[in-house]
Amino acid sequence: MRASRNPRGTRTAPATVLLALAALSATPVRPAAAQTYAQKTTAAVDYILVHSERESMMQVPMCDGVRLSATILFPKDRPRQNIPTVLIFIPYLTEGTIRGGLFSGFIRSFIENGYAVMIENVRGRYFSEGTYTYLVGSGNDGYDTIDWIAKQPWSNGKVGTIGCSSSAEEQHKMNAARHPAHAAAVPMGSGAGIGKVGPYNEMGNFYRGGAVQGVWFSWYYGAGYKYHPTWPANLTREQMLRVSKFWNMEPELMPRPNLDSAVWTLPINKIMHNLGAMPSDMDDFVNRLPNDPKWKAIEFGAEGDRSGAPTLYINSWYDLSIGPNVAMFDYQTKNAATETARNNIFMVVAPTLHCNQGQVETEHTVVGERDMGDARYDYVGLVQRWFDHWLKGADNGVTKEPKVRAYMMGENQWKTYDTWPPKNIDLVPYYLDSDGSANSALGNGRLTTTKPAKATSDAFVYDPMHPVPSLGGQICCFAVNPGGSFDQAGLEMRNDVLVYTTPTLTERVDVVGNIEVSLYLASNVKDTDLTIKLVDVGPDGKAFNLDEGILRVRWREGWEKPVFMESGKVYKVDIPPLVTSNSFAAGHRIRVEVSSSSFPHFDRNLNTGGNNYDEKDPVIARNVIHHGPAYPSRIVLPIVRSVSTKTAQ
């Protein structure tokens, strides 16, 4: 995702930018907690400053004549010859990349091991020429940059790429461009750079299930602006070095936005105006529907893009893009351009937030409110061995390790798999059932592996002016909606939330992989949203969210054209799959929540059947979920076969 920035102008990297520069690497060794994260960062920065030589304001020419600005860090006291290079291609400040976030730990390791590190700004950002438009040109610019590096007299002709969030998203098209010098890639939390892949088509996470993700109003206000002060064309490097001593091109005084009230603005295409935001792509994006042909101009990584470089994906269960990220791993495993690339697609999935890996883990890693146990992991070690193998030819066994290493929440252990989804799973349907009143956790909603014999239904009212509040989840960089796993028990007291729960489990149930969702809906309106949330309920009643999904019902038949509902008619609605890895322990219960809103994580459907983005007068929806023999509303859980699926009856 495009990481956010601190609205207070500073000359250090904003906190949320540091989040986006943090997720990197993995081996099963858990590092000792002798130093805090802040201490390790300080030590890494000190090492970089002492042991590297910096070449700033390098002007890298693109094929269209635009020059991109780059800083190169060389290992000190070593000959500048036959050097492998790691490229970080970013829209953020170079100094923030070096001094903040886990990138400092990676850069230190690269310098220690004899690598050059090149940090280059994408076009239109800071001292790079051109106009910033998200991901437009990333494939060509990435190819040209790798070509430039490979031709330098100090290069060994091999380039690795690494990044989290924006600097990972840029790698999709770069990898698909298949420059022969692009030897290995490490994209982390890169879903905002993904278009159509597998069951997902989120236009780079702008949408989920056709609903706008609220985080983008925050990100485009603080980081995604299109214009900035610029300089005369064709300044020399020496002139740019002099200029850069006086300006760093970062806004000094950015007014703090009142997001708490702004997110309630209707129509939503007035939110950026009301915030007083600088012009950005958001001014255009917010006025598009998912089937707008203009989305095709953005260079999302998608089906048809076949990676040329071996790729190590690093993701997290509470990343806003976890579904597309996992789907991209699966796609490239089957479709990468060469046998070498296909056989060397690896993935690590942590239990943390977007780009948080390596920053928050302790013996008791808390994500939101849930203790995930000891989730520490040597990310730097794995990435270093990955690049040593592919850029230096080291025979270190890194490619002989399991293809997937994913953290199982609940059990709080790292697990390894040869494939994803794992082979030893059974797809087990869990059916929604009730006595006609599943409203709130006090209702009679049931979740059962037995298909209901009796037709029943549950009705609720969705009022867009009183939506269900978002609480945690797969979200990033959005102050009004922190991400992670939170106790949902309070929200489950609302009558506009349908709650379906299993009996208490007598034995553990391990759920690993994609979770299919099919609901049968009738409504009095032409269009509405359906939301679903998977929850782990402990013996103490705390109900921790695992993943959630949404679908704007007009898109239930695909993204080509909307199909509206007729009042009272029952429709099958397949929500894009959820994905998780969680062990439901004996004594716990599996729960599903169904509603029509999760705000401000997703924009509110005004239920009119109109564009939604330019409307301000909502219609109240009376939505009915049907279940029974003719309408088997259900979720399908991927359950590990070696663990019993029995529940108390």
Predicted regions and their residues:
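Short beta-strand/loop motif that positions the catalytic acidic residue
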Residues: Y313-N315
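Accessory cap/linker subdomain of secreted extracellular hydrolases
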Residues: E112, A176-R178, A184-R306
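N-terminal cap/lid segment of alpha/beta-hydrolase-fold proteins
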Residues: T41-R78, T501, L505-E507
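Cap/lid segment of the alpha/beta-hydrolase catalytic domain
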Residues: D77-A150, P199-Y200, F206, G358-R370, ...
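C-terminal, loop-rich substrate-recognition/catalytic regions characterized by aromatic stacking residues
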Residues: L235-K270, Q357, T362-Q649
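Short glycine-enriched nucleophile-adjacent loop
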Residues: A168-H179
